[in-house]
Design a protein with these regions (language model features):
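Active-site loop of short-chain dehydrogenase/reductase
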Residues: 10, 75-77, 124-137
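Conserved glycine-rich cofactor-binding loop
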Residues: 18-19
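The beta1-alpha1 cofactor-binding region of Rossmann-like NAD(H)/NADP(H)-dependent oxidoreductases
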Residues: 55-65, 99
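Conserved NAD(P)H cofactor-binding loop of Rossmann-fold oxidoreductase domains
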Residues: 83-90
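Substrate-binding pocket helix/loop in short-chain dehydrogenase/reductase
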Residues: 91-94, 98-103, 132
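Active-site helix of classical SDR
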Residues: 117, 154, 162
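Active-site loop-to-helix junction immediately N-terminal to the catalytic Tyr of the SDR YXXXK motif
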Residues: 144-152, 164
């Protein structure tokens, strides 16, 4: 059963909204009447979003591109849904992760949310309305130590950060 969210006129940013969970989120939001801007590193052949920006969210510059696109295409934002995440770290647990792998995990799974929230939340506070959703992982509580230590730690940090915004 699909609930009626009545998102008519709501402006939404969905990170990583071109495939998988993100694409499904964009589709649902559009069905509920929202105006949606989404991101990915590369523009897809087709998108259900109203606007798209190609940006590498693991970088400050990529996050800044998204903030600029939100202002240009949406004039601000009412809802932010952070779907971006994943891991390319090697298996082998803690011992297999060097400084570079740890930084990559944080750059993908934690810092984009912090950077985008920091830039867009003041506008939501000014309009006294808004919602931020951070998609994390069960691994924030139940990590797979032999394969996803950095990912799990970054998602746990994202969950703690999210609670701090409440």
């Amino acid at each position: 059963m699909l609930m009626d969210l009545d998102l008519q006129g709501r402006r939404v940013l969905v990170t990583a909204g071109t495939k998988g969970i993100g694409k499904a989120v964009v589709r649902l939001l559009k069905q509920q009447g929202a105006t949606v801007l989404t991101t990915a590193r590369h523009e897809p052949a087709e998108s259900t979003a109203d606007a798209f920006v190609a940006a590498d969210l693991t970088t400050i510059q990529g996050c800044n591109l998204v903030v600029d696109a939100v202002q240009k295409h949406l004039g601000g934002v009412d809802i932010i849904i952070h779907v971006a995440g994943g891991s390319t770290a090697p298996g082998g647990g803690f011992a297999a992760l060097g400084e570079e792998e740890w930084q990559q995990e944080l750059n993908l799974n934690l810092l984009p949310a912090v950077r985008l929230d920091r830039a867009l939340l003041p506008g939501m506070l000014a309009q006294q309305d808004g919602v931020i959703i951070h998609v994390t992982s069960i691994q924030r509580e139940l990590p797979l130590p032999e394969s996803t230590t950095g990912y799990a730690a970054a998602k746990a940090a994202l969950s703690a950060y999210s609670k701090s915004l409440s």
